[in-house]
């Protein structure tokens, strides 16, 4: 049995991740039952799961924020440390179905102005020579980007308080519609 006090879930066609919001446990399920368990070192804010069961999570504490990808055994695949002064506060995370592309939405503030930031990280060949695997970065002034998701392998979207953007491109996403 599992003790999940504040459950949140992300579902794909073949996998599901159940996480304890503000807790430290993520359970990954597939058709044949429990596929894996992840125990985090910091409280969980958001999760996203790929078809294979790779999990991406936004973790936060009072002093630090991280975006980490785990395999189904709980091993860390990728770890991005974030800061308010750097990329901003991570608001949402989404993984492509194959787990190769990660979309992260950040909220950044400076001198009383807000900016939504949308970053894409490619863990395949397209991102292997890039710093932190980052292949696309776009800033949206006076916009809070709140929710992002992949529609298919080639298309993703982000929704903000005054904008909706659609990106296309399997390896290096480019803004297609605003």
Regions inferred by a protein language model and the residue ranges of each:
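A short beta-strand motif characteristic of beta-propeller blades
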Residues: 1, 32-39, 76-83, 128-139, ...
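Post-signal peptide N-terminal segment of secreted/secretory-pathway proteins
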Residues: 1-42
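Repeated scaffold domains used in trafficking and secretory/extracellular systems
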Residues: 2-13, 42-53, 86-95, 137-153, ...
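Hydrophobic beta-strand positions that form the internal "hydrophobic ladder"
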Residues: 16, 54-56, 99-102, 156
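Residue-level marker for isolated small/hydroxyl-bearing positions within beta-strands
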Residues: 19, 57-60, 104-107, 158-160
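Structural motif
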Residues: 24-28, 63-69, 110-122, 161-169
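Short loop/turn segments that connect beta-strands within beta-propeller blades
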Residues: 29-33, 70-75, 123-126, 169-172
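Eukaryotic tandem repeat interaction scaffolds
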Residues: 152-178
């Amino acid at each position: 049995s599992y003790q999940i006090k504040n459950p949140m879930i992300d579902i794909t066609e073949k996998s599901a991740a159940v996480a304890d919001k503000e807790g430290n446990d993520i359970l990954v399920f597939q058709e044949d039952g429990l596929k894996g368990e992840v125990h985090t070192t910091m409280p969980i804010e958001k999760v996203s799961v790929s078809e294979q069961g790779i999990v991406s999570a936004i973790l936060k504490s009072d002093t630090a924020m991280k975006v980490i990808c785990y395999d189904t055994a709980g091993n860390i695949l990728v770890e991005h440390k974030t800061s308010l002064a750097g990329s901003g506060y991570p608001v949402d995370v989404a993984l492509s179905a194959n787990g190769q592309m990660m979309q992260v939405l950040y909220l950044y503030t400076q001198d009383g102005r807000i900016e939504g930031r949308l970053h894409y990280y490619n863990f395949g060949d397209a991102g292997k020579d890039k710093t932190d695997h980052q292949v696309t970065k776009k800033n949206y002034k006076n916009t809070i980007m709140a929710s992002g998701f992949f529609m298919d392998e080639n298309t993703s979207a982000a929704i903000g308080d005054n904008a909706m953007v659609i990106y296309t491109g399997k390896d290096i996403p480019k803004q297609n519609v605003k």
